[in-house]
Amino acid sequence: MRGPGRALFFFLAVAAFFAATIGGWRWHEGARVVRLGGDRAAYLHFDIVEVRLETKDSDLDDEFRRTPPRAVVTRDGETLTTIAGIRELTLTRAAPGVWSARWPVPWNAPVGSYFPALLGREDLKERLRVAPFLIGRRAPIPLPKGGFVVATLESVAPLSTMRVKAPDGTEKDWRGLLDWAKDLGADAFLILGGQSPGLQDGQVWVETNRGILPEVAKECHARGLKFGTYAMFSLTMSKTVKIPGYEYGLEIKDSKPVVTRAVSIREPKRLDDVAAFLKPFADDPNVDFVGVDYIRNALGGYELTDDFAAEMPGVKVPPEWPKLSRDERMTWLARKKIMRKDSDFIDAWQWWRARRVALVVKELKRRLGDAKPLWAFTLTWDKGWHHGQDVVMMNDAGVDYDALMFYEADKPQYDAMLKDWHAYVRRGDAQLIPGNIFDWELHQKDPAGPAEFGRRMRRAVDDVYGDGPARAVFFHDLARLLWGRLGPWGTKGWADEARSISRYVKSRAASAPEKKP
């Protein structure tokens, strides 16, 4: 071989040598790198972060098998304690070179970057590559500007035969309800459309008004009202009739499970049926929003025991757990919850149920689409947590209008609830619509009657958020306003107060700058 050929051969040999050398160096460096981060880049508030450590160093992997790696999650340099008192994570081997632990996102965690940190391994400092993860929020469909007032009707009484005494004293058909909505200063009418079980054997829904609701929607639009309809998700209105194919929630009495009238929140067929019921309304151009009530484990919930123990980080079960029967495991959870001595355990139970509800909402929203706002009713004791609801998770999952049911509490309880809400949530966290009920009995027959109703509503508007007034309210419900327990003030007295509240919330909305979640 001579001349150019020999030179080319020499060049290729040198190139191959350097390629092999550099490639070997890169492989060696890659094998040395230890990566620590989340299993994805971003999370929402109902998520459980999988903190992962990955290495191609087999010697280090073997070392971790003898002494598992430990980690924490930090924000702004501060180590965080999350749900169930979880602070330090001990990672377990998920695959060769892969170690992981689960970290539930804290209640209403601030938006921003979070950094996992490896503990006790200063020797790996130069090799460690840490990837932060983001906790964010979903942006909901905005509320109408200038304040928003909703009048509800929680009734499946036949609209076709309904007679209503209108505000002017004349007797009308169901259209009289819309007269009242307008008279109260409402911008929207929301009606219960889906209640279970049906009137016939095996029927899922009471079908009495289903066919007439599109006509009601058109009439609302003709009057300048928005229209919405909702379905009850978990609770059914019969103590004896069970819908075929459903799993129902379980309560524990005398150490034995008792079937309730609430469908289990994990029942997939219920999600199918609710989505199928609401979808035609979500697609109807005359329907402005759709919603759900009882979107929680309304009764019982102990059928979820095994799921909770398996899925929720930080839950410590007794050593004999695998040997216990299902009834015994449910009884253990019931006693643990009722005793309320373990605050971390209660925190875990509440968070995990709220997560399960949020996952149901997320799937419901996916099936209904993003074109229309999704409304949900939320109970207000302990910010909803007591009932397995969290408005921040709900917002992230797909609820656009979260209606807070400030019902039934006496004055000290009402003050305590509002104090909790004020400390917990800000206007950018979720779109809250506080509401109150036309019912003197549920105001403890306060001598002020409707004036107490109004006082509570104004307080909720002013104080539910920690940084400004609410921009919407709802009145529950027109059936109670017309035919309910109203004391000596009657319909007119309560309606006058509601009208005043409508003006109040709109004036507050106009004077306060809008803050987007």
Which positions does each model-derived feature cover?
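Alpha-helical scaffolding within the catalytic cores
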Residues: K172-L177, G211-L213, K362, L379-N395, ...
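Aromatic-lined substrate-binding rim segments of carbohydrate-active enzymes
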Residues: G176-L178, K182, L190-S238, A348-L368
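Mature N-terminal, pre-catalytic/accessory segment of carbohydrate-active enzymes
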Residues: F11-I191, Q203-V204, T208-G211, K506-P517
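Polysaccharide-binding and catalytic clefts of secreted carbohydrate-active enzymes
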Residues: W180, K256-Y401, M405-E408
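Active-site-adjacent "subsite" loops/lids of carbohydrate-active enzymes
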Residues: L143, V149-E171, G211-A217, K226-P285, ...
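Catalytic domains of carbohydrate-active enzymes, especially glycoside hydrolases
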Residues: G169-P197, D284-D288, M394-D402, V464-A472
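Substrate-binding cleft of secreted/luminal carbohydrate-active enzymes
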Residues: V399-A416, D420-K516
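The substrate-binding groove and active-site-proximal loops of carbohydrate-active enzymes
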Residues: L153-D168, P197-R210, P257-D272, F345-V357, ...
